[in-house]
């Protein structure tokens, strides 16, 4: 990949469902092993500097994108047998224990493969951490473990693992380890995707180098000191886009901004619009404190003050990023832009 080679001096591109990948020079390799183990092996090789691929006197940045756990979770092609054996005899109701789960869904049969994939990823990622320690790099390396989305896994009676404001889909891990600099704790910071890059730069001591046009914020001071004087966000945006216009060949050319919402410390709100009229067609409103499993969708008209406050915060955030809902003034009767 010419683009990948331009962005990164050492690159491995891999398709986890197919047993092949391409290296920096575009050469194809067929590892014939489960992708997370292959990827952790490539990271370990890079850290050990096999083949003299990096300058050991300079800092390094590694991004590892492991595909599992990822649907369909149907067979041992999606996980390692040793991991599946840990779960194969477990009753489904001992694995899927959330009260909003529907065990009658066909997807429930995937649970054992799903948890096997999670276990395998844990082991593969652990191998990287072990290597950092063996090489004496663990004390001066910022390690971040995150995900792009969650997995509903039969919660809310939906087959879709993502693309929703439900907690199982929207809440993801963001674990940061920096020995001696960050004290272990759990923080309720509402970190959003645009904040990740500037925060990572801040963690690396490069806060002064963050470009002015970056929309996200650097929350590194909060990681170093939970009492740091910095304004915490009161909410995080939920954005759902679907396919828009297509050309004569059926290829998607634009997207349709189907839903916008906001998640705060207490509430989750999502508004969905009709494709033709762009008027409200569905809403989701949950009190995540009183109803943590989001079992009761609250009517908007019976919670006007709460909805007005949430829409006000959401409108300001959409305006800040020049979102299509703001530029087209979608649902302006509810959202004060």
Language-model features: where?
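Short, small-residue-biased leader/transition segments that mark boundaries at the very start
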Residues: 2-13
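Long, internal low-complexity/basic segments
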Residues: 298-337
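Amphipathic, non-transmembrane alpha-helical secondary structure
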Residues: 5, 37-51, 126
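Non-transmembrane alpha-helical segments in soluble domains
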Residues: 44-48, 115, 122-129, 133, ...
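Active-site-proximal cap/lid insertion segments
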Residues: 15-29, 47-193, 202-213, 275-279, ...
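Outer-membrane beta-barrel proteins
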Residues: 30-36
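A short aromatic-rich beta-strand->coil structural motif
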Residues: 43, 61-64, 174-175, 200, ...
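C-terminal cap/loop subdomain of S1 sulfatases and analogous C-terminal strand-loop tails that border
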Residues: 149-155, 182, 194-197, 202-288, ...
